[in-house]
Curated annotation (Swiss-Prot):
Organism from which the protein derives: Opitutus terrae (strain DSM 11246 / JCM 15787 / PB90-1)
One Pfam short name: DUF480
Sections of the chain in a coiled coil: none
Family, per entry: Belongs to the UPF0502 family.
Protein's name according to its UniProt entry: UPF0502 protein Oter_3715
């Protein structure tokens, strides 16, 4: 699917700078840049080849992708248009490298950047998953400590950067998602309806009937087997 590098924006009241809406490729490229800055700063900024590898790595990524250099370059161009990435050409390096302006653009602290980085690279996460998966970037002392960071991002001005999704059926925790891919529609975020309760007695009766049928079939098969030797 072709990716557009034309900046898309969400409409906000006059006077506010629009929140950029990132494509899937831009989300992955930005997440990879942020992650490598926090976890391996000695190799940051990244060359194009290193950035391609960071986008395509199979660990800590959901979904797993296989971008080529042209795709990643388009993502970089889009991020640069949205003032979220830059080209670095140091005096001691002949190779062009790339960095991000994520924290500066949204005035974020390290804890906030770590949370958003995981959401960019892995999609919606529960608070427990976020605390576990941000460990290399920022060590949250407790789950309440993480919850405070999530709350701060959800109340960020002028535009929230994360939101909580309705609890899924069968899950104890709600999930958190970033809003840099656009706002979450209410209809798609509505929780699935609860399944009707199962009558336990009826279920047991059905299980017993199925076992009896299997036993009858086994008896018939054994009887046929015995006749071969009579």
């Amino acid at each position: 699917m072709a990716e557009s590098t034309t900046p898309e924006v969400v409409a906000y009241p006059a006077g506010d700078e629009p929140l950029p809406v990132l494509s899937e490729v831009e989300v992955r490229v930005l997440g990879a840049l942020v992650e490598k800055q926090l976890t391996t700063p000695e190799y940051y900024p990244l060359t194009l080849n290193a950035l391609v590898n960071a986008c395509n790595q199979t660990s800590s990524r959901d979904p797993i992708v296989s971008y080529d250099e042209a795709t990643v370059t388009r993502g970089l161009d889009g991020l640069r248009d949205k003032k979220l990435a830059y080209v670095f050409a140091g005096a001691e390096s002949r190779v062009v490298k790339f960095g991000h302006k994520f924290a500066e653009r949204f005035e974020l602290g390290r804890a906030e950047v770590a949370v958003l980085c995981v959401l960019l690279l892995r999609g919606p996460q529960t608070p427990g998953e976020l605390r576990s998966r941000t460990g290399r970037m920022h060590a949250f002392e407790s789950l309440p400590d993480l919850e405070q960071t999530i709350a701060a991002l959800a109340a960020k001005q002028p535009h929230p950067l994360v939101t909580r999704l309705p609890r899924q059926t069968g899950f104890k925790e709600v999930r958190v998602t970033h809003l840099l891919g656009g706002s979450v529609s209410v209809s798609s975020a509505e929780p699935a309806p609860e399944p009707p309760p199962v009558d336990r007695t009826m279920q047991l009766d059905q299980d017993v009937a199925a076992l009896r049928q299997e036993l009858a079939e086994l008896r018939e098969q054994f009887a046929a087997f015995r006749k071969q030797f009579e």
